[in-house]
Every structure is written in C-alpha cells, then in structure tokens.
C-alpha cells in the first residue's frame, strides 16, 4: 500500500515537472505572436508539417517585422531590414488572387528579405498594368494539379528559378498525384475557418519555435559555424556554385523546360522561362578562382534553338554590377535584392509586351488570310 502511494506521488511529481514543457508549445501557438522567436517572416508563416494545406504559408496573414538575411542571422554581419508580408486565402504571398500573369518559382519569386511592394509580382504588376500572381514556392506540377487554374487559367506562366536549382526542376508529371491530392485537402481546409485555424495552430505547435531558437543560439555560441565569405560578402555555396555542366546534363534540363512549354501550351497558356543568376555567378570575381560560369548562356542558347521563350537576366545583371557598381544581392543573403528585382521586372515586362504585340499582329494576319 505504501509502495503504491510512493509510485503515485512520483508520477504526480513527474507530471507536474513535465507539464510546462507539454503546455508551452500550445501556449506558443495559440497565444504568443508567431514571430516572437523567429528571425524572418518566412519561418513565421511557412507551413512546417501540415502539408495538407493548399499553400506554403499560412493563409490570410499580415506580418511586419525587422528581419535578417539567411546566411549570418544574429551575428555582427547581419543586415537588419523591416519588411511587410501579406498572404492570400490560398497561402501564397499575394494581396489578392487575380491572375493575368502567373509566376512560378522559388524563394526569390516569393521575395525572401523583400517587403511586399518589392516582390517581383508587385513590381511587374505596376510595370505591365496587369494582374500578376505569385505562385511560389511551387512547381509546374503543383500548378497543373490545382483546379482553380484549370477553371480560370492565366494568359502567361513565367517559370523562374535560381541558377543552382535549375538542374533539380522536376519533369512534367513527376509529382502530379501529390499535387492534386494536396489541392483537394487544401480546398477542404480553406472552406472552413475552424479547420483553417486548427491546421495553422497544429502546425505552429509542431514548429517548437523557442526550442529551435535556443538550439540555434547554443550552436552559435559554442559550435563551430563556418561561413562562406569572401571580401565581406556571404555566399550560400561558394566555388561549387559555378561548376561545369556537361552537354548531356544541359540537354536533359532543356528537355524538362521544353516539356513545361508543351504542357502549358496544350492548355492555351504561353510559357516563358526566366533564370536568376547565382550570387556566385555575378560576383564571381570575389571568389578565389574568379571563374566565370557559362551554364546560363549555354542553356539559353539551347532553349532558343528549341523555340522556348527565355528571358536573359544575366547580361543585365552583369552590366549593373560590373559597369555601374550596383549591388544586386544583400551582403548577408543569397537572394536577390530590390534593385535586381526592379531590373528583372523591367526586362520581363518588355519581353511580355513585345510578345503580346507580336501575338496580336499574328492574330490579325490570320483573320485577314481567312477573309
């Protein structure tokens, strides 16, 4: 009998001891501000484990905070910047869901370390005078598996990728079923405010933000964090980013992009590809080898040969940085900055407007021929 009481007391003490640790994640998710323990809005709003939600971020959110670059956060090298984020009902970084031109891409298209008005979608929208929708981070397969774009397709889809990720772009159909399944579950969650709140809260609990921030601080204090930095610029990969690509690799990548063109054209949608040069590419003279990569010029030449529309950002970026001394990437981050976005939007807008006028002339000529 005495032993039973002792066991019960021990269990009670253990429960009381564990209670704060069990309740804290719930308190963190349900009561505290989402950005209390994060260094960027990205970590605050990004979906962690609830991959049944329709988008990569929590829907219908607004966050304004001071954040730092991904390569040297909470260090003397960090460049602090106040940014604003809005997400739409589907969990993508947009103020609304209107879509004439749709951008598919990675975190550069989302606008990491950029404020909402500086993102490519908003800058391009102002320059084009058309509604531009940011569908990022996402893939062409996610787009093809999303019902709302079947019902209301955009006029143009621009697929963009940072140079180092181009070789990883999935072929059409590679993740088709997964994209359709997530679209179905996401639609169901979006249809209910209660389900949306439950999904977001459960996901925030799974993040364990304070725990992860504490581990990161311990690692920075006692660990041996190695930074890739040359001449006071931080890089994500350094020299390996400027590796050589074989002709076989180049053709395989071109096959994937040509597949995007055919898949979108079969739906009556124009396809344009816009690569974004690596920081290591444009800043290659800062690296020890000073080697200038040739991957993007070779890829663009191959795509033009296949009559795949491609926008050349590299030439403009090289001119801005090398001839006009305009920095195109933050010191502490691998993503492009607002000046690079402005330049890319200008090139893309000019390309799309020229393309529009050509299509209009072709259509008029076709009508005349039929008459």
Residue ranges and their predicted role:
Residues 1-371:
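Extracellular glycan-modifying ectodomains
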């Amino acid at each position: 009998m005495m032993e039973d009481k002792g066991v019960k007391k021990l269990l009670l003490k253990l429960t009381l001891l564990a209670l704060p640790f069990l309740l804290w994640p719930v308190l963190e998710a349900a009561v505290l501000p989402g950005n209390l323990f994060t260094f960027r809005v990205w970590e605050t709003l990004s979906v962690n484990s609830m991959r049944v939600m329709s988008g990569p971020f929590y829907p219908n959110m607004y966050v304004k905070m001071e954040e730092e670059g991904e390569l040297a956060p909470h260090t003397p090298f960090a460049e602090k910047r106040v940014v604003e984020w809005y997400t739409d009902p589907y969990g993508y970084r947009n103020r609304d869901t209107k879509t004439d031109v749709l951008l598919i891409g990675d975190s550069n298209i989302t606008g990491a370390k950029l404020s909402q008005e500086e993102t490519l979608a908003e800058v391009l929208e102002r320059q084009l005078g058309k509604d531009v929708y940011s569908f990022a981070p996402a893939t062409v397969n996610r787009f093809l598996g999303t019902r709302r774009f079947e019902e209301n397709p955009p006029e143009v889809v621009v697929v963009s990728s940072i140079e180092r990720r181009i070789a990883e772009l999935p072929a059409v159909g590679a993740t088709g079923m997964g994209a359709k399944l997530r679209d179905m579950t996401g639609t169901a969650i979006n249809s209910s405010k209660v389900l949306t709140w439950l999904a977001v809260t459960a996901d925030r609990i799974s993040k364990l933000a304070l725990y992860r921030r504490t581990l990161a601080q311990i690692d920075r204090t006692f660990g041996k964090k190695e930074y890739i930095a040359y001449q006071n610029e931080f890089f994500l990969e350094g020299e390996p980013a400027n590796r050589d690509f074989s002709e076989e690799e180049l053709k395989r990548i071109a096959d994937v992009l040509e597949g995007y063109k055919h898949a979108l054209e079969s739906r009556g949608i124009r396809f344009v590809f816009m690569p974004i040069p690596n920081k290591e590419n444009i800043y290659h003279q800062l690296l020890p080898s000073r080697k200038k990569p040739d991957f993007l010029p070779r890829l663009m030449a191959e795509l033009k040969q296949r009559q795949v529309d491609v926008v050349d950002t590299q030439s403009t970026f090289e001119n801005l940085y090398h001839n006009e001394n305009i920095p195109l990437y933050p010191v502490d981050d691998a993503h492009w900055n607002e000046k690079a976005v402005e330049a890319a939007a200008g090139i893309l807008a000019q390309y799309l407007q020229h393309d529009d006028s050509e299509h209009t002339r072709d259509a008029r000529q076709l009508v005349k021929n039929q008459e």
